[in-house]
Amino acid sequence: MKFLIVLAVAVACASADVSHIAKSDEYAAPVVKSSYDITPEGHFQFNYETGNGIYAQAEGAVKNVNSEYPAIEVKGAYKYTSPDGQPIDLAYVADENGYQPQGSHLPTPHPIPEAIARALAYIEAHPPSPSVVERKVVANLLG
């Protein structure tokens, strides 16, 4: 019985239609230009360009080297054409504040409704007094 199952699986694999799986030249794109520069101080810079129109570049350095919390700051960009034909052009900064991409293809947040913006401005202009906040915290702790 096990032999028949193994034989059936082997026959199914051998006769599977794989003609729809097409190999693309995208995977074999030649590198047209490439440069890398790394210094002992922690600075780096690189860029490359491929034959199918992909381009990327970045540069970075260690900030606050002698502090307790050194951080790496990287600025870069890349561009390519998406499979649906849309040109993708993205610039980014990555530092202690996180990854911050910018590009016309990225979604943008909806504008803040006017009523919410007014409420936020009012709260900022009229902060609660510290005694009110302290009383509420103590009341919550006591129960």
From Swiss-Prot:
Component of the cuticle of the larva of Bombyx mori. It comes from the Eukaryota. It comes from Bombyx mori. GO terms for molecular function: structural constituent of chitin-based larval cuticle. This is Larval cuticle protein LCP-17. One of its GO terms (cellular component) is chitin-based extracellular matrix. Residues 41-110 form the Chitin-binding type R&R domain. Keywords: Cuticle, Signal. Residues 1-16 form the signal peptide. InterPro entries: CHIT_BIND_RR_consensus (IPR031311), Cuticle_Struct_Prot (IPR050468), Insect_cuticle (IPR000618).
